[in-house]
Amino acid sequence: MSDIEAKIRSAWIGRISGCQLGKPIERMSMRDGHSALHDYLSDVGPLPLRDYVGYKEGYDIQKECCRGFLSRSEPDDDINYSFLALLMLEEHGRDLSTSDVARTWLKRLPAAQTFTAERAAYKVLLERGKEWFPETGNAGFDLSACSDNPYNDWIGAQIRADVYGWVCPGNPELAASLVTEDASLSHRGDGVYGAVFVAVLGALLMTHTPAEALRTAKTYLPENSGAIIAVELAESLLA
């Protein structure tokens, strides 16, 4: 196994296991807030977490994703986008366009598995797109309307981004180009910048040290953007 293949395998494992780690309590954190989440985690196991989340009766969490009950990777909307990215790259390669992403969503992505910016973009595609757009031709309207939504600077496009980096080892420019086509369907500004950062970082980590990859990936973010501020804040917390 080559070094790059080993890194890609590890990236897949990290992607899926990380998703499963947070999945049981995802709704709790959004519904009940940080304090309730912290209390639950403190009750079922020591913090900081060093294993999957434990299960306790009486809480509305996904038992099948908890420590002691895991038998597989449970379906998740975040992982769906990783597979969609692979499908689109297999079909379109370097020529992937935002229109291709829109068609793929309509043909392969259940509407009920979209949320926030993606749901808003999907709704516009259904309402304004030509009936036969998923099969051929143009959408019949300017696709930039899909990203005109209240969530377009949220992290959804970042969640969709990592595969574009993995398949471009040592080629951050191509990774940035591909992920921009995908991200632009539903996001703008920092929503796209964050996705570019994730994809570029993934491409660079295949051939560079983590420190080198991070340093170079930051150069793809506009100065004073929310994305660069967030990255530098994270760095400061590690200092």
Which residue ranges define each predicted feature?
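Structured, active/binding-site neighborhoods that engage oxygen-rich ligands
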Residues: 1-239
